[in-house]
Each structure stands twice: as structure tokens, then as C-alpha cells.
Amino acid sequence: MDEITYDRVQEESNPKVKQLYWDIAFGLQDVDGLKPSQYMKDLSEEHISGKKTYVQVQNEITSYYSKNKDNHEDNDEEEADEVATAIYEILSDKSFRFDFLTLKNYHKRLFINLDKEKYNPGNFRNYNFTKDEPVLKGDTVQYQSYDLIEETLKYDFNEEKDIDYSKFSEEELIDRITEFTSRIWQVHPFQEGNTRTTAVFIQKYLISMGFNINNELFKDNALYFRNALVRANYTNYSVGAKETKKYLNMFFENLLLNKNNDLNKDDLKI
């Protein structure tokens, strides 16, 4: 009997796919108001055209910031460049396992080359925090307590594993994906980078289930996605605000069902 062999996964060669992955990687930095450097953009163009491999781009961007630590003052550009490079790698990687450990691994890969004290890559936070949200007029979402992070994620992931999306209507599908995404984001397990980590994980999860998704939404609407998550987890009756998943549903309808909902960031303000 002929032995069935494994095929080693090769680096993505399609320029259009590479362009899309870089666009998403750059676009997701918008959730924190970050923009990639011109140097990073130039490297990505060389990669898309086939002049450089991904490994060469990765090594060059890491070397660039290592050599210029003392002279480089724009830490925002460094973060955008390093994280975008890692996001490209994860999106182009064909492997995936549905587990909260994968979520931790993605966070580690995104932030491993940045300030260890600030990002604590791949580790759950060990303190509680708040974050002033412009969309909430400076108020904060109530995130999960740090001592319940792992227990909560285990529960949410185990519950999600039992879901059979093949039995769902389109409306049920959107509601469930929205609910799961909202839950893991509300936990906010990491010190920094929760939205970008969540966005990458959800994209990989949906692709692993065979859904055809409009990835360009993450390229163009990253800040809307983040603010929709905020509104899905915020209630304050004193200002007439109740948590609503309407905006997140609209995002996922466009992502999964190719609808054309108007994703206007201003609509999310309370």
C-alpha cells in the first residue's frame, strides 16, 4: 500500500492574498490609533512583489528596531510594525486549534518583541484595571476580575465547543458568533492588546470552520469593531445606556453574510 505523505505548508505566494493579509495587519493597528512606519510599508511591498520572503521581512524589522533602540523615539511605530508583522504570520499560517491556549499563544506572538513589563506577552494579567473609552464619554467597561480569567475562558470555550453551527439559521449564527466574541473580549485577559488578539483569533476560528469571510472588514473597520465590543459590554442606566450587541451583529453580518450595513463609528457614541 502506498504511504500517504504529509505536504509541508509553503509560504503564501499569491500577491493578492499577501496584500490582503498585510492590509488587515496594518488596519488592525487602528484600534489603538497606531500606524505602521514607511519602512514597514516598503518592506511589505517588497514581500508582496516577491523580492523578499516573509522571514526576511520579519528579521529586517526586528533588526531595525534592535539596532535603533536609542535613536528611535516613536514607540507607536515600533509597536505597529512588530505587531503587524506577527499578525501577517498568523493569518498566513494554516494551523489552528480551538482552545484558550491558542488565544494566549497569539498574544505572545503579537507582542513578544515589545516591552515585557507593559505587554507581558502570552500571560494573563494579575491585576484589575479600567480604561477610559471616548465612545463612552470617558467611562469604562467592567472587565472580568483577574482571578477569574482562566476559569471564565475555560467555561466560554467549552460551551462554544458544543455549538453546531450547521443547525443554525443565519440570524442564530450571527447572534452566537457575536455572543462568543463579546464574551472573550469582556474578559480582557491581557494587560494590553486584547482587541487585536481577539480579532485575529476570531478570524482564524471562523476560517477553521469553513466560513467564507470578508476579511477586508477588519482592514477598514477595526475601530468600529472595537467600539462595537465596548457597546456590547456597557450598561449605565444613569446615562440611558444599556449593553447592546446590535452594532457587533451588523459587523458580523457584513463579515459572514456579505450584507452592506453602514458601519458608522459615530453611531456607537452614547
Where are these regions (language model features)?
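FIC/Doc superfamily catalytic core
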Residues: 1-270
